[in-house]
From Swiss-Prot:
It is found in: Cytoplasm; Membrane. It is a peripheral membrane protein. This protein is encoded by the haplotype B genome of the allohexaploid Solanum demissum. The gene is R1B-16. GO terms for molecular function: ADP binding; ATP binding; metal ion binding. This is Putative late blight resistance protein homolog R1B-16. The keyword Endoplasmic reticulum does not apply. Residues 534-821 form the NB-ARC domain. The keyword Acyltransferase does not apply. One of its GO terms (cellular component) is cytoplasm. Residues 1217-1284 form the HMA domain.
Length: 1284
């Protein structure tokens, strides 16, 4: 209906005028919203001017009355009443000459008075439907549906407003309004159904459409005359009376419209007309036509027990069909139409006959209609199963985590204990399924641990089928618990699942019984992907890399050396290797040069023949020789000579194992160049030289390559250089991308406009063309890594991803397959290192102490690939701003959804019952503002949700404790206590909550019933009932990380540590005033590796010594301590590797004494803001120290001289310390470098006298203004040492 633009213009006018009033407030906005709603409803009635019923019942009178009201202001009403109302309202509402309240009150009074007058004489339309002579254009179903949509939109406004200060607020329960809304929506579905199914318009259809229009208009009038109560200040009708009015209206709908014309007769007539000519169904989504909504209409409220079975089946059909495209059905759509129409005829006939005779039975209806319900129910049953199973199966993602069976087996065991009554009828079948899955666990383990076996494809196909069956079992078991599927259907479905699992096992057993000789056959056929490198291709960039590699080839060790070059696809590894291989200065130093390209799938014989051809020439007779003779021939050919071999594109270690025996080592400086995408292969092949990870291009190299490829030997025009530089930068430093774009530019006119167009569209072109290369790397990923890799598509562009968070998400998503004796986190780290080794993931940060990856990110090309491929695989779907919810019907179900706004989550929630993960990604990367978001009612639709990661961006009003499948929850809260119902989330493994403000959060004792918790992170929490915690004997054996409990007493800390015996990381805050002697040593869990301890009150003494035999990382902050305390603590921390002291004051006249043997394994010592003057360190202390960092230790006199003699020391950093500390640091550097030849040593000085020298790079950097003479002295001194 064409009123949106006018209303939008009207709203803008309101806003313009309200800005002119002295006070701009929410009240003003509420008034504007009120008037807009009133006018939108009136607009609906104005579109009914051509209908007789609208005139006879008085609907048009009220519109005319409004026009007459306009005339009272001595201004003739314009043709467009809306334009006139807009002008009038602006004058009355916001006139400067009168108070805004006066204008508002006046206009509201006029509206309400008119409603009162009309309500007294309004009645339901009584006109005979047959007498309604209307134009075809007005009675078409499109108009009826458009009118119903407008009414639904107006009612939705009243339902959604929960703010009592709004003039549109409706107090009390809104169930009646919601029921009316449902009726209207189902009526629209019925109209759409009839419209889509009828071939030619008939009398029955016209009658039905008119009736639908009468019902919708009457609903709109009843609501408009009586609601909203606050806005109209309705004193004569209370909210309860309005609800009663609506309820009475609902009952009236099933009565006769007038004698001789029954509503049910109209529906029966139209359904019988459709039944006689069921057309070929359109191949569209079933939900678009409301194909099964009609029989489950609210008329079924009064159904007798005889119809209950039919109602149950039809509801199941409706609920499952809504997500299923017609094209995926395994039967004719006409069959479903026939079933639905028959069911509708049964229902409406039942009501029609019940109206005539109260004791009407089902048999009476069957005789009247001429068919048997019992017989007709059977095809409905069959159809229901087909639809339900197909709807579920077609919505499953095609990529799965192999750890899903682990999760299912644990839940099946728990379910049988928790819901024994629900499982009573199906216990035997479920136990059979449980045993079958347990028997398949060894097979899944082999798939993960031996991904490159001969039957890789078959193994992965079987593994995916197993995981899909696990998802199906979860769905059926949940339906068993929640009574979502009748028992007659569950039994058959479970039996079919058992049969399917048996078939999968037979396939696996058949694979395992293949003849042993077949198992040893290496499926290495000639690859169509193998390529011959271009020998003379000129390389641009990597000048420094080439020089280093040339030096390794010509010099270095006398023994054989394999120089491995690895990096992601498109970096230019092959081009770089061929540049060296064809370099005359290199080739001239070798007796034999030979090369081969291995590729992903290769023939061992072909590789040997290629190398022999380069070494001794072509000989066709060699192809007839067996592989072992060819290998021996090659080895003998190379044995006495110095050789250079290029082995390009090696994909796995086994390929290198096949070839390495052919390359003898006789200490004659023979060299092998090997290129690979995978770090693990490069490392495996390296002998003396470290693998070279080929970097990306820098800015200058990117531009030079682009210019070279586009202009050849010529230079770029100055007019094009700016846009050219921008294009080169947008290529992401990837040589392959640069070459692809250069190919596009070479074919275009050398005009700025053309290049600008390329720059604007660069992302799409680059990524589409690069996809084939990335796709090849993805294709060869083992099954268990594919889901891990695609999951990166859930992160934002250039986002630095915290590894701890990533691994927790992977585990919660069941991507990690368990292995006996190994932690899931350790296995996940191995998965990540594998992806890094394949150059699919870039490391952005590693831990200084152990080198473990702490953060990573994906290159844009790879990120886009992950997003696109994940969507294709039904794995992950991004829902962005303003994306239509109608798109859900054109997509299958996705296992994971990433939203950019909470509003999108609200709109899509109704279509996400099978979604497993919801991830909120805020592009602004900052917390969204309060107030708290009401989330509980939305998440009820996500019944299988396992991951809810709101990234601390959204404040939620409550914790969704109904989602018992949930394994990962991350959000922000504003409550000061966690509800005891949190224990309902008995599958929860990771709970991360952040508070909007700094306060203590009370944790209920029921948390200790959540035995699957692995990671618990809540700021400043304390037990709500310490006595209950003490009495509760449960322990969280699986809990590994805990932050941040607040301990006011040592006893509290002792208690919590006893409850968490397997902690590995603890961040806590303590406020212990005094420490009793019996607690002199606080024993932390034996597995604890990381401890961060903060004092709530600065510079109080830590009242206990820390005992943690396996602690590796300790951070103490805001404390007061002495040498004795640290000495006694050190005695209990023999394996400590990292010690960080922040804001610490020392007693004993600000002195710290470190005795011999203290901190024997310490590698990193960081001291920041220490109140320390004198530091005395024994000669044998810190024997393995590698890094010393001093920040803001302004009172410290010097660094102890014994640091000069620590052989492991590599790095000292001094920031904002006094001059004597800087001098002592430089003296340590001098001794380390000159006396001990420690060329790896690096000193960084920041702040006063900030002169930084890097001995390895022979570089000096001044980071602040320093006296020039002093800089000169430092430079001369460093030059004498050969350091610059």
């Amino acid at each position: 209906m064409n009123f949106n633009n006018e209303l939008s213009d009207l709203e803008k006018s309101f806003l313009f005028w309200t800005l002119r009033v002295q006070e701009y407030s929410y009240d003003t906005m509420h008034r504007i919203d009120f008037f807009l709603w009133e006018l939108q409803v009136l607009n609906c009635f104005l579109h009914l001017q051509s209908f007789t019923f609208a005139s006879e019942c008085g609907m048009l009178d009220i519109s005319q009355k409004m026009l007459e009201i306009c005339k009272r202001f001595n201004t003739p009403p314009p043709h467009n009443a809306f334009a006139y109302w807009k002008e009038l309202i602006c004058k009355r509402l916001c006139a400067i000459s009168i108070r805004p309240d006066d204008g508002f009150a006046y206009w509201k009074k006029v509206i309400w008075k008119t409603k009162q007058e009309f309500r007294a004489k309004y009645s339901f339309p009584k006109t005979l439907l047959a007498d309604n002579k209307v134009d075809d254009d007005d009675t078409n179903p499109e108009f009826v549906m458009e009118f119903i949509d407008a009414v639904v939109g107006n009612l939705n406004v009243l339902v959604k407003i929960n703010d009592p200060s709004s003039l549109l607020f409706v107090p009390g329960p809104k169930e009646q309004i919601e029921q009316v809304l449902k009726e209207l929506k189902l009526l629209r579905f019925f109209v759409c159904f009839v419209s889509n199914k009828c071939i030619e318009p008939q009398y029955q259809h016209t009658t039905f459409y008119t009736h639908a229009l009468i019902e919708a208009s009457h609903i709109a009038m009843v609501v408009w005359l009586n609601l909203p109560i606050y806005g109209n200040r309705n004193q004569d009708l209370a909210s309860s009376e309005v609800s009663c009015l609506l309820s009475n209206f609902m009952e009236m709908k099933i009565k006769s419209i007038q004698p001789g014309i029954s509503r049910n007769n109209i529906y029966i007539d139209v359904l019988q007309a459709l039944k006689s000519t069921i057309p070929q169904a359109q191949k569209k989504h079933a939900a678009e036509s409301g194909i099964v909504e009609i029989p489950t209409h609210s008329l079924m409220v009064g159904l007798s027990d005889q119809m209950a079975n039919l109602q149950e089946m039809l509801c199941l059909l409706k609920d499952n069909l809504i997500h299923l495209p017609i094209l995926d059905l395994e039967f004719q759509p006409q069959d479903m139409d026939s079933v639905i129409i028959d069911a509708g005829l049964l229902i409406y006939s039942f009501y029609d006959m019940k109206g005539e005779k109260e004791d009407t039975t089902l048999e009476d209806i069957n005789r009247e209609l001429g068919f048997d319900l019992s017989r007709n129910i059977e095809p409905i049953k069959v159809m229901i199963y087909l639809v339900m199973q197909k709807a579920f199966q077609c919505n499953l993602p095609r990529i799965h985590g192999l750890g899903y069976v682990d999760f299912l087996l644990k839940n099946l065991k728990d379910f049988q204990g928790r819901y024994s009554d629900s499982f009573a009828l199906h216990k035997t079948q479920i136990q059979v399924i449980q045993k079958e899955f347990e028997s398949l666990q060894p097979f899944l383990k082999v798939v993960v641990e031996e991904p490159h076996n001969t039957f890789k494809r078959l193994s992965e196909d079987c593994a995916i089928q197993i995981i899909r069956k696990a998802h199906e079992v979860e769905y059926v078991v949940d339906a068993c618990i929640n009574k979502g599927i009748p028992h007659w259907r569950l039994k058959g479905w479970l039996q079919i699942i058992i049969e399917d699992i048996t078939c999968i096992k037979e396939k696996i057993q058949e694979k395992n019984t293949v003849d042993d000789t077949m198992k040893t056959v290496i499926a290495r056929t000639s690859s169509k992907l193998a390529r011959t490198p271009r020998m003379n291709e000129e390389i641009v960039g990597f000048k420094d890399v080439i020089e280093n590699l040339r030096n390794q080839l010509l010099n270095g060790t006398k023994g054989q050396d394999a120089i491995s070059i690895h990096g992601m696809p498109g970096l230019g590894k092959t081009t770089l290797a061929n540049t060296l291989y064809s370099d005359r200065s290199v080739v001239s130093q070798f007796d034999i040069c030979a090369q081969c390209c291995v590729s992903q799938v290769y023939s061992y014989k072909d590789l040997l023949l290629a190398l022999l051809c380069d070494a001794v020439g072509e000989d066709s007779d060699r192809r007839e020789l067996p592989d072992n003779e060819l290998a021996d021939m090659l080895r003998k050919t190379l044995l006495p000579r110095r050789y250079l071999i290029l082995v390009d594109d090696v994909w796995d270690n086994s390929a290198w194992d096949d070839l390495r025996g052919c390359f003898p080592d006789v200490n004659n400086r023979s060299r092998i160049i090997l290129t690979t995408r995978h770090h693990e292969v490069a490392k495996y092949a390296s002998v003396h030289s470290d693998p070279l990870h080929l970097r990306m291009f820098d800015k200058d190299e990117s531009w030079k390559l682009l210019e070279k490829k586009v202009f050849g030997e010529q230079s770029c025009s100055p007019l094009l250089k700016d846009v050219g530089l921008r294009i080169a930068k947008m290529c992401g430093q990837l040589p392959l991308s640069i070459v692809l774009v250069a190919g596009i530019l070479s074919e275009m006119e050398k005009e700025v406009e053309c290049w600008e167009q390329v720059a604007n569209n660069l992302g799409t072109h680059i990524h589409n063309d690069s996809r084939a290369i990335v796709n090849q790397s993805y294709h060869v990923l083992p099954c268990h890594l594919k889901s891990c890799f695609l999951y990166f598509g859930a992160f934002l562009e250039d986002e630095v991803i915290d590894i701890s968070r990533l691994i927790r998400l992977w585990i919660s998503e069941s991507f990690i397959k368990s292995s006996e004796g190994r932690r899931l986190e350790d296995i996940a780290e191995g998965y990540l290192e594998n992806l890094i080794g394949r150059n699919l993931v870039m490391v952005t940060q590693r831990a200084d102490s152990d080198g473990k990856v702490k953060a990573c990110r994906l290159h844009d090309v790879l990120l886009d690939f992950c997003k696109e491929r994940a969507a294709e695989e039904n794995f992950l779907l991004w829902i962005n701003r303003d994306q239509s919810t109608n798109a859900v019907y054109s997509h299958k179900r996705h296992a994971h959804l990433a939203f950019t706004e909470m509003d999108s989550l609200v709109e899509w929630s109704a279509s996400c019952s099978l979604v497993g993960s919801v991830l909120l990604k805020n592009y602004a990367r900052r917390p969204l503002s309060s107030p708290a978001f009401s989330i509980s009612h939305i998440l009820l639709n996500f019944k299988f949700l396992k991951v809810l990661d709101l990234e601390h961006q959204v404040v939620i009003d409550s914790i969704p404790t109904e989602l018992f499948y949930l394994r990962y929850l991350s959000a922000r809260i504003e409550q000061n206590s966690i509800p005891s119902s949190i224990s309902n989330l008995w599958n929860l493994e990771t709970l991360i909550l952040k508070h909007v403000s700094r306060c203590t959060v009370l944790l209920p004792s029921t948390v200790w019933d959540m035995v699957k918790l692995r990671h618990l992170h809540i700021p400043n929490f304390r037990p709500e009932n310490e006595e209950a915690l003490l009495e509760n004997s449960a322990k969280l054996y699986d809990l590994e990380t805990l932050s941040t409990p607040y301990f006011s007493r040592v006893e509290d800390a002792e208690l919590m540590l006893r409850k968490t015996p397997n902690l590995r990381k603890l961040v806590c805050e303590v406020e212990c005033l005094e420490y009793p002697p019996q607690y002199h040593v606080l024993n932390f869990p034996i597995r604890l590796e990381i401890l961060k301890l903060y004092r709530s009150k600065a510079f109080n003494t830590i009242p206990f010594c820390i005992s943690a035999p396996n602690l590796k990382y300790l951070k103490l902050s805001r404390s007061y301590m002495d040498s004795q305390y640290l000495s006694e603590t050190a005695d209990h921390l023999k394996n400590l590797e990292v010690l960080k002291l922040y804001f610490v004051k020392f007693a004993d006249h600000r002195e710290w004494k470190v005795s011999n043997g203290m901190f024997p394994q310490l590698k990193i010592l960081k001291l920041e803001y220490l109140a320390l003057m004198k530091w005395i360190v024994a000669d044998d202390a810190f024997p393995n120290l590698e890094q010393l960092v001093l920040h803001e230790c302004r009172h410290l006199m010097e660094i102890p001289s014994c640091f000069m003699d620590i052989p492991s020391l590599k790095y000292i950093e001094v920031e904002n310390c006094n001059e004597s500390v800087v001098k002592s640091a430089m003296n340590i550097q001098e001794t380390q470098v000159e006396d001990y030849q420690n060329t790896n040593f690096k000193l960084v000085l920041i702040g006063i006298e900030s002169i930084s020298t890097d001995t390895k790079e022979k570089k000096l950097t001044v980071t602040r203004d320093v006296d020039a003479d002093e800089v000169q002295l430092v430079v001369e001194k460093q030059r004498k040492r050969g350091m610059l």
